[in-house]
Amino acid sequence: MSFQIPRGTQDILPEQAAKWQYIEHIARELCRRYNYQEIRTPIFEHTELFLRGVGDTTDIVQKEMYTFEDRGGRSLTLRPEGTAAVVRSFVENKMYGDPNQPVKLYYMGPMFRYERPQAGRFRQFVQFGVEALGSNDPAIDAEVIALAMDIYRMLGLKKLKLVINSLGDVESRKAHRQALIDHFQPRIHEFCDDCQARLHKNPMRILDCKKDRDHELMRTAPSILDYLNEQSRTYFEKVQMYLQKLGIAFEVDSRLVRGLDYYNHTAFEIMSEAEGFGAITTLCGGGRYNGLVQEIGGPETPGIGFALSIERLLAALEAEGISLPISEGIDCYVVALGEQAKEEAVALVAALRKEGISAEKDYQDRKVKAQLKAADRLHATYVAILGEDELQKGVINVKHMATGEQQEVSLHTFISHMKHVLQ
């Protein structure tokens, strides 16, 4: 019987893993610059966390979660997103008492959603995200957006569009909610079952419907921006002002609501405008969630964050034809001829590795020509050739693979020589 990976998953082979490692390095380095610290949470959580944290009217909760019962009869769910788990940890570990507010965290790891696999979309996917908890300053909204944009820019992406919106505070959303109900109610029967169910539970989510997005009532739906009270409007204006100060271009789209129930005030998405990227252009999404900490059992605490898919990021890089500057080769391949030379090669390779030099040798008992081909396939910068004659003379031949330049080096100084030429 032959086995294949489950639908919606992928194997990340070594040549691809190098790209992932580079992206992860860039993300971590930017988090260091922005003073965000890493947090790691379990891959599965109690199902109730996502029902309360993500929202029971969302597609994620209703259609996409991988939920199971453990042997103790507890309902557990593979995490479909990262924010709810980070906030749960923030509350459980009483991080709201940290004197260094806001608490700035980032996470990276696999998420799971049962959705239709397509280009750049998988049922197991890796998210990178940040959360800033404890500040109501619109400047941190702009900082979070700037961090997301910086990740894409450092990787070379240029064809990007930032879209922002305000979902307002509780008072603003209440007024807008009633306006949406009044707008859609007379013809709600023309909409899909999901929209009909959302009309009185969370009518703003109707605006996020993919099936009915071209319906004429969608185009004429009341704009949240017309229902913002003075406090919400002022907050949104300050976010825009800070983005302008940072030199970040953006568009305001009053129909942007995001797919999770916990957002309020600022909501944003970063999209790819690269040709041939596909119908789903969103690379990153985020926003403010001032009520989520309280919903999960903590004190009233403001928060804002974003999440991006590494798979979508890789697809965007491919669409723009961007190659990442990753090192594909090893520093030195030691070619050994004869039994005594093979024994010496083991020690030489170990000594190189101890000095931080990537090194390899033959383990297949291949001839010299085959060993040289192996070194070439590994993109070795140097090849060090050691035979019986070299052993008797106490030397080793070092060849630069790109230029063909060859040099005889004393075995006693070989390691220091390699450190010098590889600087």
Swiss-Prot record:
Natural source organism: Anoxybacillus flavithermus (strain DSM 21510 / WK1)
GO aspect biological process, one term: histidyl-tRNA aminoacylation
Record-level GO cellular component terms: cytoplasm
Pfam families xrefs: HGTP_anticodon, tRNA-synt_His
Subunit: Homodimer.
HAMAP family the UniProt entry points to: His_tRNA_synth
Superkingdom of origin organism: Bacteria
Catalytic activity: tRNA(His) + L-histidine + ATP = L-histidyl-tRNA(His) + AMP + diphosphate + H(+)
Annotated Gene3D superfamilies: Anticodon-binding domain, Bira Bifunctional Protein, Domain 2
EC numbers for this chain: 6.1.1.21
CDD domains: HisRS-like_core, HisRS_anticodon
Gene Ontology molecular function, alphabetical: ATP binding; catalytic activity, acting on a protein; histidine-tRNA ligase activity; transferase activity
Name of this protein: Histidine--tRNA ligase
InterPro entries referenced in this protein's UniProt entry, alphabetically: aa-tRNA-synth_II, aa-tRNA-synth_II/BPL/LPL, Anticodon-bd, Anticodon-bd_dom_sf, His-tRNA-ligase, HisRS-like_core, HisRS/HisZ, HisRS_anticodon
Protein family (similarity comment): Belongs to the class-II aminoacyl-tRNA synthetase family.
